[in-house]
């Protein structure tokens, strides 16, 4: 399905600033749909006069009347005369069920049209769809307050003053109309507060009604932090004076945490009050704090495991120095390398907030010490080409162990003892599904008759076990094209069954 940007690029020649404004409108119009109890469609006009629907929104506060997906619909201008007239004249209008007989909208619901102005140009038209009976029947206090606010916002939309560019980001995580709605008059007095808004204020410690009370006078004594209370006071005053912009803020009061979003209502250059959306997020914040505490505990555990492993590595290193048996010393040094590799993974996890390990950072920290613990005297250059990316902690340790074992195996066994130097290269290529790693050396190549499955090397046995049991991956060894050996490792990025090369 085409996005709004794709449809605008395909059917219009609007400048980038106008396109950004339409994106901002779509970012805000869920609030419009909820306040109106109505569906909205956004129409643009092509150069040939044909109308194209580029976006659609359904209300959360009532039933939808547009049951089909209208996005991408292309209609002639004479099929929607009211929309075409609004593009030309820039004036809102309404079409009842009777008047729709000559229109493409003929399913018994009323349609109202509103221009979307950017600068001096009507860049789009919104059609609002609601049942004919709902548009005519007498509304309750909540519906009346919602619809009056929606009318003000639509007039601001027609004047090009809504939405404000700075409001787009905050709208994505703001309270919804159904969470709690407060309407202020020009003096800051609450003219309407929805039941959910009143409940949120009661959680904050209010013991009286909100309607008919100055919002600042009711709110300021409830807020725990005096600086925060002063900030809310100043913001609401600026909002009512027409000098302020909308704001999103969290307020702690009476042991509760509420999320507030303010919307200035300025119609025809005149301040007509403000709308406040409010949501009680006390339980959400409590869960957030619990998760933060849990994450901190997990990171502390990783930190302590890293410290313990480093202590074990230091003891093994000390024992290796005191051991006179060459074979025993080599085994201890290999153990030091393996323990150090695992310690580095836990070190990375102790600094991670999402249990994800940056494999490139860990590998780059391990590679410089590989030569130091090797039992060969010749210098071996070790390089990494490509990005390994990030992996979940469950498999990161296993993959790091596999790569370090393969590199160490190449350092120890791939080169002629008489060779002056050599090189080992780790090549990584990652797609959406796979992580492919090739450990290449420019040594002697595989011995004749060598079999990975029959090898009695402890390092390769560890590698085979980890690849099959922990990584659900596949492993193969082959002679390189020019010289040396390629060890080919393929690991699924997601959880998958075992694969064979």
Swiss-Prot record:
Binding to c-di-GMP activates PdtaS autophosphorylation and by extension phosphotransfer to PdtaR. At the opposite, autophosphorylation and signaling cascade are inhibited by NO, copper and zinc. Activity is not inhibited by calcium or iron. Full inhibition of PdtaR/PdtaS signaling cascade requires the transduction of a cell surface signal by the intramembrane protease Rip1. CDD domains: HATPase_EL346-LOV-HK-like (cd16951). It comes from the Bacteria. It is found in: Cytoplasm. Autophosphorylated. Its main location: cytoplasm. Residues 300-495 form the Histidine kinase domain. Residues 179-291 are annotated as: PAS-like. Residues 4-150 are annotated as: GAF. One of its GO terms (biological process) is phosphorelay signal transduction system. Gene3D superfamilies: GAF domain, Histidine kinase-like ATPase, C-terminal domain, PAS domain. Member of the two-component regulatory system PdtaR/PdtaS. This two-component system plays an essential role in mycobacterial adaptation to poor nutrient conditions. Nutrient deprivation results in increasing intracellular concentrations of cyclic diguanosine monophosphate (c-di-GMP), which binds to the PdtaS sensor and promotes its autophosphorylation, leading to the activation of the signaling cascade. The phosphate group is then transferred to PdtaR. In addition, the PdtaR/PdtaS two-component system controls copper and nitric oxide (NO) resistance downstream of the intramembrane protease Rip1. This coupled Rip1/PdtaS/PdtaR circuit controls NO resistance and acute lung infection in mice by relieving PdtaR/PdtaS-mediated repression of isonitrile chalkophore biosynthesis. Two signals are required to fully inactivate the PdtaR/PdtaS system and mediate NO resistance: a cytoplasmic inhibitory signal through the PdtaS kinase mediated by direct sensing of NO and the production of PPE1-5', an NO-induced small RNA, to sequester PdtaR. The N-terminal sensor region consists of closely linked GAF and PAS domains. Binds c-di-GMP via the GAF domain. Copper and NO are detected through a dicysteine motif in the GAF domain. Was identified as a high-confidence drug target. This is Sensor histidine kinase PdtaS. It comes from Mycobacterium tuberculosis (strain ATCC 25618 / H37Rv).
């Amino acid at each position: 399905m085409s996005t709004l940007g794709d449809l605008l690029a395909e059917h219009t020649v609007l400048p980038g600033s106008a396109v950004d404004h339409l994106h901002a409108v779509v970012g805000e119009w869920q609030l419009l749909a909820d306040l109106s109890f109505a569906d909205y469609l956004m129409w643009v006009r092509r150069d040939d006069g044909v109308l194209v629907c580029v976006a659609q929104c359904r209300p959360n506060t009532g039933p939808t009347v547009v049951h089909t997906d209208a996005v991408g619909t292309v209609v002639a201008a004479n099929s929607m005369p009211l929309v075409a007239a609004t593009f030309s004249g820039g004036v809102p209008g309404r079409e009842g069920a009777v008047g729709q007989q000559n229109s493409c909208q003929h399913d018994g619901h009323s349609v109202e049209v509103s221009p979307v102005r950017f600068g001096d140009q009507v860049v789009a038209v919104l059609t609002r769809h609601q049942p004919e009976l709902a548009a005519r029947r007498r509304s309750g206090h909540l519906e009346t307050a919602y619809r009056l606010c929606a009318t003000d916002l639509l007039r601001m939309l027609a004047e090009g003053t809504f939405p404000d560019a700075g409001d787009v980001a905050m709208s994505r995580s703001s309270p919804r109309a159904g969470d709690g709605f407060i309407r202020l008059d020009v003096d800051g007095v609450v003219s309407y507060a929805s039941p959910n808004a009143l409940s949120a204020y009661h959680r904050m410690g209010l013991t009286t009604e909100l309607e008919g009370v100055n919002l600042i006078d009711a709110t300021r004594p409830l807020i725990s932090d005096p600086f925060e209370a002063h900030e809310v006071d100043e913001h609401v005053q600026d909002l009512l004076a027409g000098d302020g912009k909308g704001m999103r803020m969290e307020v702690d009061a009476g042991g509760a945490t509420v999320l507030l979003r303010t919307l200035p209502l300025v119609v025809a250059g005149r301040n007509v009050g403000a709308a406040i959306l409010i949501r009680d997020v006390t339980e959400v914040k409590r869960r957030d704090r619990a998760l933060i505490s849990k994450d901190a505990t997990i990171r502390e555990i990783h930190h302590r495991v890293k410290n313990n492993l480093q202590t074990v590595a230091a003891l093994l290193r000390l024992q290796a120095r005191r051991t006179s048996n060459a074979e025993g010393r080599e085994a201890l040094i290999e153990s030091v390398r393996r323990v150090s590799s695992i310690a580095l993974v836990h070190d990375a996890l102790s600094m991670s907030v999402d249990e994800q390990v940056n494999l490139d950072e860990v590998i780059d920290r391990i590679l410089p010490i590989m030569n130091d613990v090797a039992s060969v005297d010749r210098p071996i250059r070790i390089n990494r080409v490509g990005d390994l990316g990030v992996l979940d902690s469950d498999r990161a340790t296993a993959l790091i162990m596999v790569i370090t074992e393969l590199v160490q195996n190449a350092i120890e066994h791939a080169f002629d003892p008489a060779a002056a130097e050599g090189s080992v290269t780790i090549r990584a290529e990652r797609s959406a599904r796979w992580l492919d790693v090739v450990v290449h050396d420019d040594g002697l190549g595989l011995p004749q008759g060598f079999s990975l499955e029959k090898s009695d090397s402890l390092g390769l046995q560890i590698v085979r076990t980890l690849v099959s049991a922990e990584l659900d991956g596949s492993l193969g060894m082959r002679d390189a094209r020019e010289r040396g050996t390629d060890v080919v490792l393929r690991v699924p990025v997601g959880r998958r069954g075992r694969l064979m090369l």
